[in-house]
Swiss-Prot record:
<comment type="function">
    <text>Catalyzes the isomerization between 2-isopropylmalate and 3-isopropylmalate, via the formation of 2-isopropylmaleate.</text>
</comment>
<keyword id="KW-0432">Leucine biosynthesis</keyword>
<dbReference type="GO" id="GO:0003861">
    <property type="term" value="F:3-isopropylmalate dehydratase activity"/>
</dbReference>
<dbReference type="GO" id="GO:0009098">
    <property type="term" value="P:L-leucine biosynthetic process"/>
</dbReference>
<dbReference type="InterPro" id="IPR000573">
    <property type="entry name" value="AconitaseA/IPMdHydase_ssu_swvl"/>
</dbReference>
<comment type="similarity">
    <text>Belongs to the LeuD family. LeuD type 1 subfamily.</text>
</comment>
<keyword id="KW-0100">Branched-chain amino acid biosynthesis</keyword>
<dbReference type="GO" id="GO:0009316">
    <property type="term" value="C:3-isopropylmalate dehydratase complex"/>
</dbReference>
<protein>
    <recommendedName>
        <fullName>3-isopropylmalate dehydratase small subunit</fullName>
        <ecNumber>4.2.1.33</ecNumber>
    </recommendedName>
</protein>
<keyword id="KW-0456">Lyase</keyword>
<dbReference type="InterPro" id="IPR015928">
    <property type="entry name" value="Aconitase/3IPM_dehydase_swvl"/>
</dbReference>
<dbReference type="InterPro" id="IPR033940">
    <property type="entry name" value="IPMI_Swivel"/>
</dbReference>
<comment type="pathway">
    <text>Amino-acid biosynthesis; L-leucine biosynthesis; L-leucine from 3-methyl-2-oxobutanoate: step 2/4.</text>
</comment>
<keyword id="KW-0028">Amino-acid biosynthesis</keyword>
<dbReference type="InterPro" id="IPR004431">
    <property type="entry name" value="3-IsopropMal_deHydase_ssu"/>
</dbReference>
<dbReference type="InterPro" id="IPR050075">
    <property type="entry name" value="LeuD"/>
</dbReference>
<comment type="subunit">
    <text>Heterodimer of LeuC and LeuD.</text>
</comment>
Length: 200
C-alpha cells in the first residue's frame, strides 16, 4: 500500500450527496478479485453515455479537461453508501484517487477506503461548499493534504480534520491489513507459543 504523508494534486468537485457503491463501481464489473483494472469502470454510469464505455459524458466533471488527472475528490454527505463491496475503494485507488473530502462517509466504505490507502477527510458542510465553490471559479485546482498535520491547504485557507491514530499510522507507514499483521508476526508467534504451552 502506498504511503500517504503529504499529497498535492488536482481536486475534482462531485456535487452529489449519497453517492453509493453501485455508482462508484456497478455490479457487472465485480467479477475480478484482483485490485487492479477497476479504474476504467469508475463511475461508469456517470462517466460514459454508452455501455461499451466508448463515448465520454463531457458533462461529468472527471471528464472535463480542467479535472483530468484528478487525485482528490470533493463531494457531499454520505459518500460511499449502499453495499459493502470493497471494489469501490479499489476502483477509486486504481483510477488514481488518493483522497476524498466530504462532510460524511458511510461507515463500511470509510473503513474499506482507509484499509486500501484511500484517505477519507471529513470537513463541515460549509467548508466543503467553500472548497467546491472556489474549485469551480479558480484556474488552480490543486489542493495539498498533510496527513502529518491533519490539514488541508487550498489557496490561502487551511482546513483541519481528524483521523483516528490507528488508521493515520497505517496510512503514514503504508500498511494494509496484511502488512500490519506481518509487522507483528514475531509477537503473534510468541503469543501463540505461550498460549499453546498454557493449554498443555
Amino acid at each position: 500500500m502506498q504511503k500517504f504523508i503529504i499529497h498535492k494534486g488536482i481536486a475534482c468537485p462531485l456535487e452529489y450527496a449519497n453517492i453509493d457503491t453501485d455508482q462508484i463501481i456497478p455490479k457487472q464489473f465485480l467479477l475480478a478479485v484482483s485490485k487492479q483494472g477497476f479504474g476504467k469502470h469508475l463511475f461508469h454510469d456517470l462517466r460514459y453515455v454508452d455501455d461499451k464505455e466508448s463515448v465520454l459524458n463531457m458533462d461529468f466533471n472527471l471528464n472535463k479537461k480542467e479535472y483530468q488527472n484528478s487525485s482528490i475528490l470533493v463531494s457531499f454527505e454520505n459518500f460511499g453508501s449502499g453495499s459493502s463491496r470493497e471494489h469501490a475503494p479499489w476502483a477509486l485507488v486504481d483510477y488514481g484517487i488518493r483522497a476524498i473530502i466530504a462532510p460524511s462517509f458511510a461507515d463500511i466504505f470509510k473503513n474499506n477506503a482507509l484499509g486500501n490507502g484511500l484517505l477519507t477527510i471529513e470537513l463541515t458542510k460549509d467548508e466543503v461548499l467553500e472548497i467546491v465553490d472556489e474549485l469551480k471559479k479558480s484556474q488552480d485546482k490543486n489542493i495539498e493534504i498533510s496527513l502529518l498535520e491533519k490539514r488541508v491547504f487550498f489557496k490561502d485557507k487551511i482546513f483541519s480534520f481528524d483521523l483516528d491514530d490507528f488508521h493515520r499510522i497505517c496510512l503514514l507507514e503504508g500498511l494494509d491489513n496484511i502488512a500490519l499483521t506481518l509487522k507483528h508476526e514475531a509477537q503473534i508467534k510468541a503469543y501463540e507459543k505461550n498460549s499453546k504451552s498454557f493449554l498443555v
